[in-house]
Amino acid sequence: LVIYAELLFLYLQLQFPYTESQYKKIKVAFLIHNWILLILCFTSGSYMDSRFWLKSATSGADPNYLSGWFVIPLCFAVELLFSEKIKKVWKILITAQVVLSFYFIMQTASKSGLITNACVLAIATIYTFRSMIKEHPGRALTVLVIFALGVFIAVNNMPAYLVQRLSNGDTTGTGRFPMWVTLAETMLNNPIKMIFGFGTSAVKYYTGTGLVSHNTYLDLLFNEGLVGFIPLVIYIAKSIRIKIKKCPYTVIAFLGMSVLLLTLSAFNTRFFMLLLFLIGMDVTEDLE
């Protein structure tokens, strides 16, 4: 019932259209939120097991979840960074925001978090380059050189533990793949429950470890069944088809987030719900 309640609440939120100017304010709000998050990282961060954590009473402070909060702001940051309507002083601040965000993302030593945010940044930049190369080839070349230099510096200054995790695999011992196999076999052996679901939060009782599966899509399919999984997939597919031209950066953020969701149980997280809202919201032209 949880998924239906959340989807109903999401549906009610999406009954109100938003103008382009209001949508722009939402983007700015995400950038402001990101600066607040960066301030919290500086003031309330700590290291445990060679990974950066944010001191908090919620699970959102977990390194993997923390990296997820940077996805949406990074995508909007790239969009505004290359906009000709934005003043240079704001572009400098946005550049600093992107650099600091990746610094803390790397400090979390989250493989999926780093890959997700790097993909979002790269795809958003490449998408922007399509028009920039035609209109301002010199500027595009300069940005490309700066981007390549930034990647080189970042790669050569990665935390040692992150390099170890990237090269040697996950050393946390969660054993994601065996859990996925166990859950898949359980569903195949119980076709009725596969259709209607095993029940909210049931997944951790079937993994054999007492842990969630660390896969949002698998969690959803197992807990809520096909009757809960299919409506969400339809909602996402229809929203992306509509938004791909009108709000491309939101779609890029969602596609990038999908990488993180493959290794993280994040259906009930605020950043995922916000992203579902962003890809579903109706954006209309401003009235003259």
Features from the language model and the residues they span:
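Structural signal for the C-terminal ends of transmembrane alpha-helices
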Residues: 11-21, 77-85, 122-132, 154-157, ...
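Hydrophobic transmembrane alpha-helices and their immediate junctions
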Residues: 88, 130, 136-137, 223-258, ...
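Alpha-helical transmembrane segments of multi-pass inner-membrane proteins
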Residues: 7, 22-49, 61-128, 234
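Aromatic-anchored segments of alpha-helical transmembrane domains
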Residues: 35-40, 99-103, 148-153, 255-265
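A membrane-periplasm/extracellular boundary helix in multi-pass inner-membrane enzymes
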Residues: 108, 125-168, 184-189
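Membrane-anchoring hydrophobic segments
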Residues: 1-40, 168-169, 281-288
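Long extracytoplasmic/lumenal interhelical loops at the membrane interface
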Residues: 53, 57-59, 161, 167-224
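Membrane-interface micro-motifs in multi-pass membrane enzymes
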Residues: 1, 57-73, 213-216, 221-225, ...
